[in-house]
From Swiss-Prot:
GO terms for biological process: translation. Located at the top of the head of the 30S subunit, it contacts several helices of the 16S rRNA. In the 70S ribosome it contacts the 23S rRNA (bridge B1a) and protein L5 of the 50S subunit (bridge B1b), connecting the 2 subunits; these bridges are implicated in subunit movement. Contacts the tRNAs in the A and P-sites. This is Small ribosomal subunit protein uS13. It comes from the Bacteria. Pfam families: Ribosomal_S13 (PF00416). Keywords: Ribonucleoprotein, Ribosomal protein, RNA-binding, rRNA-binding, tRNA-binding. PANTHER family: 30S RIBOSOMAL PROTEIN S13/40S RIBOSOMAL PROTEIN S18, SMALL RIBOSOMAL SUBUNIT PROTEIN US13M. SUPFAM superfamilies: S13-like H2TH domain (SSF46946). Belongs to the universal ribosomal protein uS13 family. Part of the 30S ribosomal subunit. Forms a loose heterodimer with protein S19. Forms two bridges to the 50S subunit in the 70S ribosome. The keyword rRNA-binding applies. GO terms for cellular component: cytosol; small ribosomal subunit. Residues 110-121 have a biased composition (Basic residues). It comes from Blochmanniella pennsylvanica (strain BPEN).
């Protein structure tokens, strides 16, 4: 296991796939990191020298990833809630934020159905 940005990255996988295991790095960002550092996307991390791995570490450190990114997202949501915006209200009520319909669907956001338990007898 190679440690990059505080994460144990699997070294038996290709460089792009291994970098994608870091929170905040997707496929396109992983490819651009490999391109900028001059590392082939399809080489396994265990076959790279320590110099190349250090280059990867330095390239990943330029981005906001892992705990810092999670904290930033949480603070952004908290800021919306504190400001009392519509989006903050939707976050506080655990409803869809981006204008999706809620009359049907939205089960993931709303949680399991609340049954009506013979209220209308």
């Amino acid at each position: 296991m190679v440690r990059i940005a505080g994460v144990n990255v699997p070294d038996r996988k290709h460089a792009v796939v291994a970098l994608m295991s870091i929170y905040g790095i997707g496929k396109s960002r992983a490819r651009s990191i490999c391109l900028n550092t001059g590392i082939d996307e399809h080489v396994q991390l265990c076959k790279l020298s320590e110099i190349h791995i250090d280059k990867l570490r330095d390239a990943v450190d330029e981005y906001i990833v892992e705990g810092d990114l999670r904290r930033e997202v949480t603070l952004n949501i908290k800021r919306l809630i504190d400001l009392g915006t519509y989006r903050g209200l939707r976050h506080r009520r655990n409803l869809p934020v981006r204008g999706q319909r809620t009359r049907t669907n939205a089960r993931t956001c709303k949680g399991p159905r609340k049954s009506m338990n013979k209220q209308f007898k």
